[in-house]
């Protein structure tokens, strides 16, 4: 036993296949979480750097960032950890011991989605056209509430991008009910914060039109990533 690489405790060779399957599932879940976290962090970093140059020193307040970090560090990690072990994982080639955990597919998703999310955020903040959809007030409270909602909902939609390499973002999603429940809860809490967060979260209730503008802009991260996946699929990478 001491010199063995694998010890079968139940004298059943199927246990080896199960161990490999669950090991690969955990490995993939870690990768999904890394994609999600680095994408959101990339966007947040760009905003923190660019914000002061466009006249908005704090696009995201400290309290809002605490809520964002709770989603990224705790709830998202929990959601991805419940990804189901799929039999198709056993058909993949073995991973090398020295293989990097971040591959080319992940780099492109982090870079493209992160940069695109940053572009959407900056466009929102700088565009007079977008601002014209929001009620006018001295402190831009409705406009900045919309930006907070935009940032969160882009993260929620991007979670669906990160959880699968397939074009169909809902592929096998029914096997991870925790993912569905957690992101539904995050969406509900976010809606509550928009309308009842008040001065603590710097949020004030959006009108239906304002909310639809925010959701439509946030949703665009999905077709952008689907297009990226189509390019990879055409090249035979996925």
Regions from the PLM with identified roles:
Residues 49-58, 191-207:
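Transmembrane helix-loop junctions at the membrane interface of multipass transporters and ion channels
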Residues 171-179:
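Cytoplasmic-side transmembrane-helix entry/capping segments in multi-pass membrane proteins
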Residues 1-166:
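Membrane-embedded transport module
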Residues 120-124, 185-199:
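Hydrophobic alpha-helical transmembrane segments in multi-pass integral membrane proteins
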Residues 227-238:
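Membrane-interface capping segments at transmembrane-helix boundaries
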Residues 181, 211-214, 238:
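Multi-pass alpha-helical transmembrane bundle typical of ion/small-solute transporters
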Residues 147-166, 182-190, 221-228:
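Hydrophobic alpha-helical segments of multi-pass membrane transport proteins
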Residues 148, 207-221:
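Small-residue-rich transmembrane alpha-helices that serve as helix-helix interface/gating elements
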């Amino acid at each position: 036993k001491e010199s063995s690489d694998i010890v079968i405790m139940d004298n059943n060779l199927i246990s080896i296949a199960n161990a490999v399957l669950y090991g690969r599932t955990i490995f993939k879940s870690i990768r999904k979480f890394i994609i999600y976290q680095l994408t959101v962090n990339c966007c947040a970093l760009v905003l923190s750097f660019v914000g002061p140059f466009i006249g908005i020193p704090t696009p995201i307040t400290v309290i809002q960032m605490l809520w964002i970090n709770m989603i990224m560090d705790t709830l998202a990690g929990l959601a991805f950890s419940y990804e189901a072990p799929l039999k198709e994982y056993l058909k993949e080639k073995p991973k090398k011991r020295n293989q990097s955990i971040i591959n080319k597919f992940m780099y492109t998703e982090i870079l493209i989605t992160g940069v695109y999310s940053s572009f959407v955020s900056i466009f929102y903040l700088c565009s007079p056209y977008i601002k014209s959809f929001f009620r006018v007030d001295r402190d831009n409270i409705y406009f900045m509430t919309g930006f907070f909602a935009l940032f969160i909902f882009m993260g929620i939609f991007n979670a669906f991008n990160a959880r699968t390499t397939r074009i169909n973002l809902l592929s096998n999603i029914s096997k991870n009910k925790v993912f569905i429940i957690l992101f539904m809860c995050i969406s509900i809490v976010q809606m509550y914060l928009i309308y009842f967060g008040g001065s603590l979260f710097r949020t004030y209730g959006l009108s239906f039109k304002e909310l639809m503008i925010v959701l439509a802009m946030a949703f665009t991260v999905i077709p952008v990533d689907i297009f990226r996946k189509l390019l990879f699929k055409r090249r035979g990478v996925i």
